[in-house]
């Protein structure tokens, strides 16, 4: 790669009319994050010292969504073409740096391809990313003289002969800052669209005797843009297939790769098994021998060795120690923590709660703002009543406690080690060690009772 300092310009001013959306086009998500964020991440990984983001439609929403202090925001008040967009950013270019031009709606461009492009840029020339298509209709054609790139002709301006060319311009290029500023100043809009084309600088460079090096991406999907939701869905499919392939080759068993979604990053150990229709969001860590059942959603969580998550469970911002079992149909909300061997069964919800070693909450339970010790049994239908209408309060349960079914723990309350709470109890006061607590209404029997009969 060139040893020059480098800036990146990302064009993101388009309205995205064909998306039929109030959201700026580049904020539509692919794999769980805005398209333009994929491009920003690639720019950072390729070594950009400065990133200039050219925006127009929905600028306030763009800035509030991306929240990236490292970006230089450049307004393009009128959308008069790619050359015009680059002219808005040109005052920020240094003469001695390389400037790489990218697009906010071309989300799958790879760092490897960008590195190859930058390395191929000739001294004083231009590095240009091109591809060959079976059907190049609608794209700017690459013209060559004696095999060397000499210019780009937009489809609407191309002759019948030029339209037979199948090598097309992707729009991605890199050039020296001083050269780029000089060429941009010479652009005019004397063309069928009445716009300022960045592509015109290729002919300018050729006429100055500069070399233009054409580089091809590793995959066509890297340079495919998004103009409508169908194209976005297709790129999502491509991206997910690539991620699934990488995971399979790294030893993760995806039972159905076509029904797996990665919307973030996944670190994993050995012998991990993931069933169909699982969604991974944010930053997730899976230990060795973790098994995840069908239909689960795992988000921003760490799951230890030998854990098993049964089907249709949701785990978000949670921490699981080794050998924990979850679900089916369990929900771990932010702040949930399970220690070694803990079990959370079906229709159990936890939030800001810790379940100790070997403790179990088998079914139909809510545990919120709770600290639960080791070897505790939480009976079906138990609820920690943590909210009084204004503030949240904590429930503390010691080791070896037995909580019977249909128990309500009205926080703040503490249950000491070894206590037993009988089924159907409402706990409103602290319980001492090894106490039995029950608050049942006396059971009444009425012999020969007859139910009321409806009047006809």
Swiss-Prot record:
One of its GO terms (cellular component) is membrane. Mg(2+) binds at residues 105, 227. It is found in: Cytoplasm. Acetyl-CoA binds at residues 380, 386-387, 405, 423, 440. Binds 1 Mg(2+) ion per subunit. Residues 1-229 are annotated as: Pyrophosphorylase. One of its GO terms (biological process) is lipid A biosynthetic process. UDP-N-acetyl-alpha-D-glucosamine binds at residues 11-14, 25, 76, 81-82, 103-105, 140, 154, 169, 227, 333, 351, 366, 377. Its EC number is 2.7.7.23, 2.3.1.157. Pathway: Nucleotide-sugar biosynthesis; UDP-N-acetyl-alpha-D-glucosamine biosynthesis; N-acetyl-alpha-D-glucosamine 1-phosphate from alpha-D-glucosamine 6-phosphate (route II): step 2/2; Nucleotide-sugar biosynthesis; UDP-N-acetyl-alpha-D-glucosamine biosynthesis; UDP-N-acetyl-alpha-D-glucosamine from N-acetyl-alpha-D-glucosamine 1-phosphate: step 1/1; Bacterial outer membrane biogenesis; LPS lipid A biosynthesis. GO terms for molecular function: glucosamine-1-phosphate N-acetyltransferase activity; magnesium ion binding; UDP-N-acetylglucosamine diphosphorylase activity. Keywords: Acyltransferase, Cell shape, Cell wall biogenesis/degradation, Cytoplasm, Magnesium, Metal-binding, Multifunctional enzyme, Nucleotidyltransferase, Peptidoglycan synthesis, Repeat, Transferase. Disulfide bonds: none annotated. The keyword Lipoprotein does not apply. It catalyses: alpha-D-glucosamine 1-phosphate + acetyl-CoA = N-acetyl-alpha-D-glucosamine 1-phosphate + CoA + H(+); N-acetyl-alpha-D-glucosamine 1-phosphate + UTP + H(+) = UDP-N-acetyl-alpha-D-glucosamine + diphosphate. Its cofactor is Mg(2+). Catalyzes the last two sequential reactions in the de novo biosynthetic pathway for UDP-N-acetylglucosamine (UDP-GlcNAc). The C-terminal domain catalyzes the transfer of acetyl group from acetyl coenzyme A to glucosamine-1-phosphate (GlcN-1-P) to produce N-acetylglucosamine-1-phosphate (GlcNAc-1-P), which is converted into UDP-GlcNAc by the transfer of uridine 5-monophosphate (from uridine 5-triphosphate), a reaction catalyzed by the N-terminal domain. This is Bifunctional protein GlmU. It comes from Cronobacter sakazakii (strain ATCC BAA-894) (Enterobacter sakazakii). The gene is glmU.
């Amino acid at each position: 790669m060139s040893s020059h300092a480098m800036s990146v310009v990302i064009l993101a001013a388009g309205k995205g009319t064909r998306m039929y959306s109030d959201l700026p086009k580049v904020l539509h998500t692919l794999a769980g994050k805005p398209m333009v964020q994929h491009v920003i991440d690639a720019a950072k990984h390729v070594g950009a010292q400065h990133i200039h983001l050219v925006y127009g439609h929905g600028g306030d929403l763009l800035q509030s969504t991306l929240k990236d202090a490292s970006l230089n925001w450049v307004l393009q008040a009128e959308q008069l073409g790619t050359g015009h967009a680059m002219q808005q950013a040109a005052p920020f270019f240094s003469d001695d740096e390389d400037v790489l031009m990218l697009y906010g709606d071309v989300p799958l461009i790879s760092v490897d391809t960008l590195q190859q492009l930058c390395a191929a840029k000739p001294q004083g020339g231009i590095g240009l990313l091109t591809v060959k298509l079976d059907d190049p209709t609608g794209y700017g054609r690459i013209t060559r003289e004696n095999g060397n790139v000499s210019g780009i002709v937009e489809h609407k301006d191309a002759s019948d002969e030029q339209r037979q060319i199948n090598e097309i311009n992707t729009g991605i290029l890199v050039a020296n800052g001083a050269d780029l500023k000089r060429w941009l100043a010479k652009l005019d809009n004397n063309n069928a669209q009445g716009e300022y084309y960045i592509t015109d600088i290729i002919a300018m460079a050729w006429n100055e005797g500069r070399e233009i090096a054409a580089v091809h991406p590793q995959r066509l999907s890297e340079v495919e843009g998004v103009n409508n939701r169908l194209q976005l869905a297709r790129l999502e499919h491509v991206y997910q297939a690539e991620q699934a392939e990488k995971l399979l080759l790294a030893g993760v068993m995806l039972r159905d790769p076509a029904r797996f979604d990665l919307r973030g990053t996944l670190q994993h150990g050995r012998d991990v098994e993931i069933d169909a229709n699982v969604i991974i969001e944010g930053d997730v860590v899976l230990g060795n021998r973790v098994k995840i059942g069908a239909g689960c959603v795992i988000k921003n969580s760490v799951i230890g060795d030998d854990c098993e998550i049964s089907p249709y469970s949701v785990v978000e911002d949670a921490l699981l120690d080794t050998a924990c079992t979850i679900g089916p149909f369990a929900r771990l909300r932010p702040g949930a923590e399970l220690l070694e061997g803990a079990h959370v069964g079906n229709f159990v919800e936890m939030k800001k709660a810790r379940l100790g070693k070997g403790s179990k909450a088998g079914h139909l339970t809510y545990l919120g703002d709770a600290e639960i010790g080791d070897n505790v049994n939480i009976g079906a239908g138990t609820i920690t009543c943590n909210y009084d209408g204004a503030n949240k309060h904590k429930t503390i349960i010691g080791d070896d406690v037995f909580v019977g079914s249909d128990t309500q723990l009205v926080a703040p309350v503490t249950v000491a080690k070894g206590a037993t709470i009988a089924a159907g109890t409402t706990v409103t006061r602290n319980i001492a060690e090894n106490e039995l607590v029950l608050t049942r209404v006396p059971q009444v029997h009425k012999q020969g009772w007859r139910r009321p009969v409806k009047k006809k």
